[in-house]
Regions:
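N-terminal secretory signal peptides that target proteins for export/translocation
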Residues: 1-19
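Acidic, serine/threonine-rich low-complexity disordered tracts
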Residues: 41-142, 184-289
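Hydrophobic, well-structured mid-protein blocks that either form specific transmembrane helices
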Residues: 138-178
Length: 289
């Protein structure tokens, strides 16, 4: 018999002047001048990517001051339909190498479906990390000015947890937030600006915080140097002390492609470097000559 545990999480936030403005790294939200219902807040014009885009990354893991090639990751975007409506399907595959398995086994597959106006519709993450395997899913819907998300985590033995959440802001997942972010203009950001937004993980909705750090030239794994925007995803402990979780470096051009990610783990650190990109919609004008 499969065990089902269900919890409800209803969050009504009085957000009057909110609209999506930037989210990179994969991510960010900006305060705007219009009061919009949740469904409209989740909509945006796609100015950054197109069907057929394929981005490849090399993954490295640091263990006792030694950097080890840990595997590969790929990010692909293709056209699809969802409930008979045209949509985009974005896939992120992270595959650890056999050498890296000695330290930490990683087999992650993330999929999201977004509408043509980039609103979140569905998210799935299948993760094999060490001896644990889980599937996290989220289904998004919109009604009466609220964004609803039904979430489910399924374990290897078939048991599962479920949760329902609602928010007057748009709720994102790990990939839909990246898709939206890539179409926004970061020109208005100042170094140190903090961007907060709700994200569905498949188990619950969490408040995330990003900090804009500025610009820097970054050399990718393919030997190309890019002018990049830098964002940090941070966490806060019970005393309010800030802890860096991920640092994102994204191209300062219309593509807003992640070039490098620095991840700070409990048992070490990891990096992801851009190796190759195909099918990009715009020229890579961020390349430093």
């Amino acid at each position: 018999m499969k065990i089902r545990r269900k919890k409800n999480e209803i969050i009504r936030t009085g957000v009057v002047n909110v609209r999506c403005k930037l989210i990179i790294g994969l991510v960010a939200l900006m305060t705007g001048a219009f009061a919009l219902p949740a469904s409209a807040q989740c909509e945006a014009k796609n100015d950054a990517f197109q069907t057929g885009e394929h981005v490849m990354y090399d993954l490295y893991f640091n263990w006792k001051f030694v950097w080890v090639k840990a595997g590969l990751a790929s990010l692909t975007t293709n056209a699809t339909t969802y409930h008979s409506e045209p949509a985009f399907r974005i896939n992120l595959l992270a595959l650890g190498s056999k050498r890296a398995d000695f330290f930490f086994k990683m087999r992650d597959t993330l999929t999201c479906v977004i509408g043509e106006k980039l609103e979140p519709r569905y998210f799935r993450k299948g993760a094999e990390e060490g001896k644990r395997y889980t599937v996290d899913e989220a289904w998004f819907s919109y009604k009466d000015g609220l964004c609803f998300v039904n979430q489910k985590r399924t374990y290897r033995d078939g048991n599962f947890d479920e949760a329902v959440a609602s928010d007057s802001r748009c709720i994102y997942d790990m990939l839909s937030i990246l898709a939206q972010a890539r179409s926004y203009d970061p020109a208005d950001y100042k170094i140190g600006d903090k961007i907060k937004f709700p994200m569905a993980t498949g188990r619950k909705v969490e408040e995330q915080t990003l900090i804009y750090r500025g610009k820097e030239n970054v050399k990718a794994e393919n030997g190309t140097t890019y002018r990049c925007l830098i964002f940090s995803l941070v966490e806060y402990d019970k005393k309010g002390k800030e802890k860096e979780v991920i640092t994102f470096f994204i191209t300062d051009d219309l593509n807003h492609l992640p070039v490098r990610l620095d991840l700070y783990l409990n048992f070490g650190s990891a990096k992801a470097f851009l190796n190759d990109v195909r099918g990009n919609r715009h020229p890579l004008t961020s390349i430093v000559k």
